């Protein structure tokens, strides 16, 4: 196997490879760009026009997606997978990965779309670097297809284990065909966002014109302890994408895929913020109308008003000014293109 196929080992060890470019027997080029960043270029005759960005490890303790990308990259380096797409593999937060922690100083996935310019420290610099790597990878060739999957696992359990967040940007419409692709990859639900965000996938969607998704793939566990996380469908789908073997129906069906829309975000304004939910509550737990969800300074209260409301990403420990939870409601998909 080519040494650059061991990107995860290099990243965890903090080593820079001596050889920055290597070729597989079938002519696929592997090029080391930066710590945790490797570009794959297929032979020109096999290039199908897809630019695929696969990122994981934005949170260093979310290991199942990291291990998935490691398996895919090793398959390419062993000449077992034969790419027809350009691919950028990114391990988002190498230092947090080495420590086995979600982040070192602050959450990188709250530092995109310019937010890193308002901050300092290791993660702010890394967020800027990731934006640059993504922008350079996608480049100025608008004739190619751009797709970004940012792979995560959650800090809590979920009633729907594998789900996606689809970013929003003014003037763009969510794609039914992309949702069909996710459904075939084992994704059970998609949250259709309705405002801009400061996450990595929101940056690539809004600023770089990619179809982009944050994929939540189960619960965060340590390296080597992901036997209960079944990513077989996603791994098969990514292999097909990489090799250009994907089959997409002419009339996309979303049968079995649950769609949700954001109703409200719960913003933590002060240290007095209280979230009235059990510490072990699962994502997608339903909340009844009238439920007092949270309280903050100046008599701020969040009371559930929506029918069939569910909560995702409840986290009272976020910094002041950040989102401490999202109330979502079912969506009929009428706005899809």
Swiss-Prot record:
A Pfam entry, by short name: AstE_AspA_hybrid
Active site: 216
Cofactor info, note text: Binds 1 zinc ion per subunit.
GO BP of this protein: arginine catabolic process to glutamate; arginine catabolic process to succinate
Reactions mediated catalytically: N-succinyl-L-glutamate + H2O = L-glutamate + succinate
GO molecular function, one term: hydrolase activity, acting on ester bonds
Chloroplast as UniProt keyword: no
Pathway assigned in UniProt: Amino-acid degradation; L-arginine degradation via AST pathway; L-glutamate and succinate from L-arginine: step 5/5
Source species, domain of life: Bacteria
Enzyme Commission (EC) number: 3.5.1.96
Family note: Belongs to the AspA/AstE family. Succinylglutamate desuccinylase subfamily.
Alphabetized PANTHER family for the sequence: ASPARTOACYLASE, SUCCINYLGLUTAMATE DESUCCINYLASE
General function of this protein: Transforms N(2)-succinylglutamate into succinate and glutamate.
Name of protein: Succinylglutamate desuccinylase
Organism for this UniProt entry: Ectopseudomonas mendocina (strain ymp) (Pseudomonas mendocina)
